[in-house]
Amino acid sequence: MKTICFYFQIHQPFRLKRYRFFDIGNDHYYYDDFQNEEIIHRIAEQCYLPANRTILEMIKTSGGKFKVAFSISGVALEQMEIYTPEVIDSFKELAATGNVEFLSETYAHSLSSLGDPEEFKHQVKKQEDKIKTLFGVKPKVFRNTELIYSDDISAMVSEMGYKGMLTEGAKHILGWKSPNYMYSSCVAPKLSLLLKNDRFSEDLSNRFSDYSWNEYPLTADKYMSWIAATPDSEQIINLFMNYEVLGSLHPASTGIFEFFKALPRFAADKGISFSTPSEVFTLIKPVDSISVPYPISWVDEERDCSLSLIHISEPTRL
């Protein structure tokens, strides 16, 4: 049976206020509390709360067959606790269904995996503790900032005890291979990998409300027919995207919530199930290993970390 693995990323940075020359030595508080509060309230109303209600309804109306995974950065969770505790409560309600998996990542949605192994491990442990405190579970699956992955990173993640990791299905890495299979790390064979299906993910994240798209409007029936038409041997369709796709990037007026609500029914009609990453790692075996000597990510056309590495290495220009 073909299965869909939905994963949503959630991150909100602590935004910094304008800091003037004459503030140096006089003002030691750097955060823009007004902007932080305004933005997370707006995103909560547009996305987090209505999307969580939609996911909960989908789980209930499907008889528990709809499943999903979230990765919520620690700093985003901190802001929710401060400004929108009702969002935390709604995620706890989802957690109580047993149909939602919370993944681990770096606490600050940082690039520490690219340059500071000790800081990376520290942030991952801090994130584990945050998820355990809020939702009562210890994450078993890892997802790095912007899906950043390399052989070296996979070795660290495996060393920390994770059984699986999510990353980008980059074409220059896969070549002729399909992202719709499970793979493993070539340097840490016990670490299984789920790779993002770019086409199907971006049909939702980028193209859903694009009037110029030749497939507009996209219906749940049409979308599921595309997935059902993939080769029978390709058992996993990994749909990875930002949670703000629901309600913020695509406003409610586009029909995005109604589209999602219809997915379980049309999936069932075509014999397609939904699984969490942990379930997939338990049920399906890797077909091959992949080698990624240089970091990849889901950012930009190149699907690499070139822009991130520029930010790390480039000196500050005055």
Describe these PLM feature segments.
Residues 1-46, 181-191, 195-198, 210-213, ...:
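Active-site and substrate-binding clefts of carbohydrate-active enzymes
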Residues 3-8, 14-17, 21-116, 140-143, ...:
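Short, well-structured secondary-structure segments
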Residues 11-13, 74-78, 107-110, 147-150, ...:
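Short, solvent-exposed loop/turn segments at secondary-structure junctions
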Residues 52-56, 88-92, 121-131, 154, ...:
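Generic structural signal for well-ordered alpha-helices
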Residues 53-54, 82-95, 174-186, 221-227:
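Alpha-helical scaffolding within the catalytic cores
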Residues 118, 133, 137-138, 143-184, ...:
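Gly/Pro-rich turn-and-neighbor structural signature
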